[in-house]
Amino acid sequence: MITVSKDGCGDFTSVSEAVKHASANDTIFIKKGIYRERVEITAPLTFKGEDAENTVIEYGMYARMPMGNEKTGTFRSYTMLVNTDGFQCMDLTIANTAGFGKDVGQAIAVYAEGDNIRFENCRILGHQDTLFTGPLPFKEIEKGGFRGPTEFAERRFCRQYYINCFIAGEVDFIFGSAAAYFENCELFSIDCGNEINGYVTAASTYEGQAYGYVLNRCRFTGNCSDNSVYIGRPWRDHAQTILIDCKIGNHIRRELFHDWNKSSAHDTVNYGICGTNADPSELPDFVRIIDRTEADFILKSITEQ
């Protein structure tokens, strides 16, 4: 085990330095402290924080920040980049401290691209585009929009797991194409003072993929005004987001999902709920009620993979 400690009592004082010296499948234990740095992981490692609230990796890059002769852009703004299969992270906070989206644009805390990635008992904090669950969609909408570490990577099926995590943000703060499973997570929407305060998810699930986002026993909380946040909208037309036994706060819009003004997506998205405290009569026609049999099948399919 490699130990990181700011007081010099470990093997390294920097998480990035520990990563550089680690071998595949090593465990890096990170002692309490605020580590202001960007961390890039390209090998299957395990991160274990001493305490989730008091072991913090933070940085403050953002999309509108100048980088050479251009802007940083969304996908180079990350605090932590996970570009490998089989990474695990436990008991740690990863934050992008750049600030509100209206001021700085997108600012990723965790950029996760790879299969069998797992975050457990973690806090992932940001504002706009907090957590990117890669891979990217097949094509960008604007030229150069995907500039970043996996711009030219193979677009492939990637499974990710977020267990007992606290994830905070405002606009599209969980987004991407992964098959991502969230269990017993708290998804906290930050008030940004608008009539519509934001969107929790923006999936870009690939056409034909078995599932996109599945949220099981999660809690949607926030400090926003009532009826001001959507649970999701489709970043791409085949977005999938399924809610099973989730608890929805009063800040969530009664219709739950927005179509991002894409009427064509009504026939292609897969938005569904089961056992969730929402009024079915308020749901738009592109959101369906899932019965318990289908919900159990979805959960079984995920756990058996």
Task: Identify the role of each PLM range.
Residues 1-305:
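Sequence-level preference for short, compositionally simple segments enriched
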